[in-house]
C-alpha cells in the first residue's frame, strides 16, 4: 500500500512539474526575419560615443534573445554585447576609433537558432 502511495505521489509531482514549463516558444522562420540597425547620432563621428540599436521584423523577438554586434573595419572583428531595451530593440554603446565604412554583423540567438544579418555604418 505504501508503494502505491509513493508511486502516485511521484506521478503527481511529475505531472505538476511538466505543467510548469511555461508557454511553448513561437517558431521562427529564419527567412522571414529582417534586421535593421540605427545609430544615435544618425551620422557617427570617430572617437565620439555612439548608441547602436538593432531591431527585428518578421518574428516576435523578446528579452529571451541574445544579440551581439560584430563590428568590422578592414576585417578586424570587435564583438559588442547588447541589452534589451524593453521596446523590441537591443542597444549597445560604442566608440568608433577612426572614420570609415564599417560592416556590422547582427548576430541573433534565440533558443537553438542563430541568425546573422549584415548592416553598414559610415563614420565621419
Segments predicted by a language model, with ranges:
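Beta-strand-rich structural segments
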Residues: 46-60, 106
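Short amphipathic beta-strand segments in non-cytosolic proteins
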Residues: 56, 68-81
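C-terminal motif of bacterial Sec signal peptides marking the signal peptidase cleavage site
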Residues: 16-19
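Edge beta-strands of extracellular beta-sandwich domains
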Residues: 115-123
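N-terminal edge beta-strand
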Residues: 27-47
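Aromatic sugar-binding surface patches on proteins
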Residues: 86-91
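Bacterial signal peptide processing site
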Residues: 21-23
